Amino acid sequence: MRARKGGGDAVTVTARHYAATLSRHGATPSGVDWESRAAQDLRFVQLLKLCNFSRAFSLNDVGCGYGALIAHLDQFHPGCRVTYSGTDLCAPMIAEARAIWAGRPATTFVNRKGCAAMADYTLASGIFNVMADCAAETWHTHIADCLSDMGAHSRLGFAVNFIAHHAPDVPGLYRAPDGMWQAHCAAIKEATVETVTGYGLREFTLLVRFSA
């Protein structure tokens, strides 16, 4: 990845970026920087390997956007009761999510960084991919803070995905150094970390599990 100097703080940069994509594309996959619903679902499938769908559970969705994960859960896991808490840095995204999912039981949305409540599991899809003009050191601090927050608000574990280091170096995108975030996550509550690859994308998913 090309070195960057200067740039804004991570929260402001991220909120501004997604406000712009939402303004251009609306509450669609393109509005949250995914190429298609299928691409979203493929990533959700990997992240949700963390969860036990044989019983009800609570779930934090960090960087929830307009709530696309809810549509995935309703389509592919309709028999499982999930208490859902979505958070996002982008206020317009939260407004869209509240409008789309108004009246859905056990569902809340909050405009904030990190988790809004304790939950059994926490997921985050693609929230570290777009660093825009942030300096690498600033972005690494942001990621570490977010992962620590996810760990602190998860009873059973959390899952997150990253663009792999061997992916093409695209300006403004963040490619994770090999092994860096696996080691970081393993140090959170002495977690067990599973790295999921081989699903057709130049990225990986971390499933971080805590001992019962």
Predicted segments, located by residue:
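A short glycine-rich, Lys/Arg-flanked "PGG" loop and its adjoining helix->strand segment in the class I
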Residues: 141-156
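A short SAM/SAH-binding and catalytic strip from SAM-dependent methyltransferases
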Residues: 121-140
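Conserved glycine-rich SAM-binding loop
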Residues: 65
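Class I S-adenosyl-L-methionine
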Residues: 170-212
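N-terminal, positively charged/glycine-rich alpha-helical extensions of SAM-dependent methyltransferases
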Residues: 1-28
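Conserved beta-strand signature within the Rossmann-like core of class I S-adenosyl-L-methionine
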Residues: 154-164
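Conserved alpha-helix/loop element of class I SAM-dependent methyltransferases that forms part
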Residues: 38-55, 72
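Class I SAM-dependent methyltransferase SAM/SAH-binding core
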Residues: 60, 68-108
